[in-house]
A protein has these predicted regions:
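N-terminal juxtadomain amphipathic helix
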Residues: 2-83
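Conserved class I S-adenosyl-L-methionine
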Residues: 102-111
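Conserved SAM-binding motif I beta-strand of class I
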Residues: 125-130
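Conserved alpha-helix/loop element of class I SAM-dependent methyltransferases that forms part
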Residues: 85-102
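Conserved SAM-binding strand-loop segment of SAM-dependent methyltransferases
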Residues: 143-156
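A short acidic, Gly/Pro-enriched loop at the edge of an enzyme's catalytic core
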Residues: 157-163
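Conserved SAM/SAH-binding beta-strand->alpha-helix loop
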Residues: 132-134
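Conserved SAM-binding loop of SAM-dependent methyltransferases across substrates and taxa
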Residues: 112-123
Length: 163
């Protein structure tokens, strides 16, 4: 992010129904981004408040953080949790019970490709989309087809998925 980009904006409208009838119901104050606690270092902090829309009752954060700040250098790595990897193995087997003829899987926000690893073990072609530049090499080194970007209509066309 360069000095001219906005780090966050206050959201005054409900993201579900566009109402202005929002009220803060929880204010945790300014917080650093998730997993970015660095002992002794000055860190950027952002408002962490939960709004309730009194028209549709949707809960939402009061401030929208620039996604590049949160996701381009993502600090949580799925593969560091054995419990999560075990769950991914379970989930992939359960999923194939419902889609026994599946040959391809797409993981949106694939992180380091750990969920894709489980599907690859079951002989599926694996595709993923994730904006984390620091995790791209990890996921592609495992043989997954990854687009390092946010998921949208342009990125889906870049994948060249084979069904």
């Amino acid at each position: 992010m360069n000095e001219f980009q906005i780090s966050h904006i206050k959201n005054n409208r409900c993201i579900a129904c566009n109402s202005l009838n929002l009220k803060v119901i929880l204010d945790i104050g300014n917080q650093p981004l998730a997993n970015s606690y660095h002992k002794g270092e000055e860190q950027e902090e952002y408002p962490l408040m939960l709004n309730l829309c009194f028209d549709c009752y949707h809960l939402q954060l009061s401030h929208i953080i620039n996604p590049d700040l949160m996701f381009k250098n993502y600090l949580y790595v799925s593969g560091t949790s054995q419990t999560l990897k075990d769950y991914f193995d379970f989930f992939s087997k359960e999923t194939l019970k419902y889609f026994p003829d599946a040959k391809t899987v797409l993981d949106i926000a694939c992180n380091d490709g750990s969920q894709l690893d489980s599907f690859k073990k079951l002989n599926l072609s694996t595709y993923g989309v994730d904006p984390a530049e620091n995790l791209y090499k990890i996921s592609t080194s495992k043989g997954h087809n990854i687009i390092c970007d946010y998921f949208n209509s342009k990125t889906i066309n870049k994948l060249n998925m084979k069904s």
